[in-house]
Amino acid sequence: LDDFVPANHPLRPIKQMVNAALLKMDALLGRMYAADIKGGRPSIAPEKLIRAMLLQVFYSVRSERQLMEQTQYNLLFRWFIGLSMDDSVWVASVFSKNRERLIEHDTVIELFNLIVQQADEQQLLSGEHFSVDGSLIQAWAGHKSFVRKDRKDDQDADGSDGESKSGNDSDNSEAGNFKGQKRSNETHASTTDADARLYRKGKTASELRFMGHTLTDNRHGLVVNARVTQADGYAEREAAKAMINDARQAHEDPDVSITLGADKGYDAKEFIETLQAMNVRPHVAQNTSGRRSAVPDEI
């Protein structure tokens, strides 16, 4: 299959980086699958699962089922995952069965950290100049699942799964007709994803969402830290403080001032003061729309 992949294809260096990281994770992956080695049912190699999950992200494949369908005929996918032309693809349920195991052992976090370590070893990171940003992530839950918490508690008590007897959410009057109702995260929760929060930002409509946050090293624009939080008005700044604190702790010289760039949504007094206390210079855009900016003018 290697002959079918162009020499300059962008997946080639990515596969090299991923394989180098996976090689260092051999002991971790061995512990994860020790039960299978001792006589349990053989599992799909975790290295192949991880590479397949990366393809799903790179190519925005909506589901594991679609990913496996495409892998069946896509030679590039087979090459990246490590499948030959004759190998059978596995069923999509394999991802569900193994995802908890990957999460339990922080496998993806370890892979990410090892990739960042490679970038550092190649002197691609400054370690001193960063930017932070957040974005909304739509939850896999709809408005119809967002019902009153007391109603959800009643359903849990009587053993109901929250669906109508016909299995159609539209039969539920509250779930199907929510226009004009006052709904908030204090009084309502999603029966599909209890961690999702009803949230809107700017001119966007209110949706059940999470928030994703990234910390980028400015030298080459590489993401060096990332996390997902519940969606609220404080999440961006709280996540930024945690991530830049990690960067601060990782720097060899605590006296060296590092910088953090951010948009005007991060212009809040408590956030700016926290950065300054960490010896982090806040390169934050000033928000002067009907208010006084917390960012000092000299910055």
For each feature predicted by the language model, list its residue ranges.
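Polybasic low-complexity intrinsically disordered regions
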Residues: 72, 81-280, 285-287
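Short linear loop/turn motifs
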Residues: 33, 289-290
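Basic, low-complexity intrinsically disordered segments
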Residues: 4, 12-124, 139
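C-terminal structured "cap/appendage" subdomains that terminate the fold
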Residues: 279, 298-299
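Short, charged, surface-exposed secondary-structure boundary motifs
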Residues: 291-298
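ER/Golgi luminal nucleotide-sugar-dependent glycosyltransferases, focusing on the catalytic module
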Residues: 9
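Short, flexible loop/hinge motifs at secondary-structure junctions
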Residues: 1-2, 151
